[in-house]
Amino acid sequence: MELIHKYFPELTNDQLEKFDQLKPLYEEWNSKINVISRKDMDQFYSNHVLHSLSIVKLYEFEDGEMVLDIGTGGGFPGIPLAIYYPNVSFTLIDSIKTVSYTHLRAHETKAN
């Protein structure tokens, strides 16, 4: 997390907390399906989150803008960007297999 804060000191405490919660969530999901490479978990923030946030240095999304992340895979760069830009609408799209599994898990969780 220090790495994220080093390059993005403007992040609010709420945003930092959300970024801090990402790794445990990915570890949990990675134990069920291969969301991201398991060998990358040790470098989660540098290889995935920081890499996704590098877009911020090149392009600034405006409040209310709608962004489509096609082929999002494990949710990168869409999820980190959605945390960074809370007033921008992000839609993440991936294969039917990935979406179906996620939908099934969400349905099972809701039913229990």
Task: Go through each PLM region and give its residues.
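N-terminal auxiliary segments of SAM/dcSAM-dependent transferases
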Residues: 1-24
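Class I SAM-dependent methyltransferase Rossmann-like catalytic core
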Residues: 36-42
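Conserved alpha-helix/loop element of class I SAM-dependent methyltransferases that forms part
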Residues: 46-63
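Conserved class I S-adenosyl-L-methionine
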Residues: 64-71
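Conserved SAM-binding loop of SAM-dependent methyltransferases across substrates and taxa
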Residues: 74-86
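Conserved SAM-binding motif I beta-strand of class I
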Residues: 89-94
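Conserved Rossmann-like nucleotide-cofactor binding loop
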Residues: 98
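Conserved small/polar residues in nucleotide/adenosyl-binding loops
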Residues: 102-111
